[in-house]
Regions:
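Structured-RNA-binding interfaces characteristic of tRNA pseudouridine synthases
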Residues: 1-188
């Protein structure tokens, strides 16, 4: 049974998405939580990996559960019966704790043919910068890059607008069979 997982995380204390021995990663944390629920190891496939310190909202992954794992999901619905696939997110949140830095916001049976990596049709990235003119908001310290000088908003906006449109980034990619898209279409920039 393929399950789609919608994920959010604060990457501040993670060493990126991809599971690595001895390092705390988003994938390792979430897979361990689900493995505890289904009683055996699982492996997530994600729409796009992130680096250390990168946050995500709306990240999508999928996991394939075998018959025994799915049976454990179905047989442990608790007092409030609900869709077994939807219960995975709730149960993972329970394992992860009250205020986790990674969570599954939604889980559902994936539609036929769904693959988190290859079914993704768009991504949104947000980069936050603050300069010395505005001061630094301590509540944004984990998601905003502080620049000691003064940023030229107009120059940055002009440069960012050159990215709008369709561009081929094949020259920046390692040749790999699994990579089928090297084009990027930027739709907007915001100052």
């Amino acid at each position: 049974m393929r399950i789609r997982l919608d994920i959010a995380y604060d990457g501040t204390h993670f060493r990126g998405w991809a599971k690595q021995p001895t390092l705390r990663t988003v994938q390792g944390t979430l897979e361990a939580a689900l493995a505890r629920i289904v009683g055996s190891d699982v492996q997530f496939v994600v729409a796009g990996r992130t680096d250390a310190g990168v946050h995500a909202v709306g990240q999508v992954a999928h996991v394939d559960l075998d018959e025994a794992q799915w049976s454990r999901i179905e047989s442990r619905q608790g007092r409030a019966p609900q869709d077994p696939a939807a219960s995975i997110a709730r149960r993972m949140r329970g394992v992860l704790g009250a205020y986790p830095d990674a969570t599954v916001t939604r889980s559902s049976v994936a539609p036929d043919g769904f693959d988190a990596r290859f079914s993704a049709v768009w991504r949104r990235y947000r980069y936050r910068l603050a300069d010395s003119t505005a001061g630094y908001d301590p509540l944004r310290r984990h998601d905003t890059t502080a620049h000691r000088g003064v940023l030229d908003d107009q120059a940055m906006d002009t440069a960012a607008r050159t990215l709008i449109g369709l561009h081929d980034f094949a020259a920046y990619c390692k040749p790999r069979e699994a990579v089928s898209y090297t084009h990027l279409r930027a739709h907007e920039t915001r100052g």
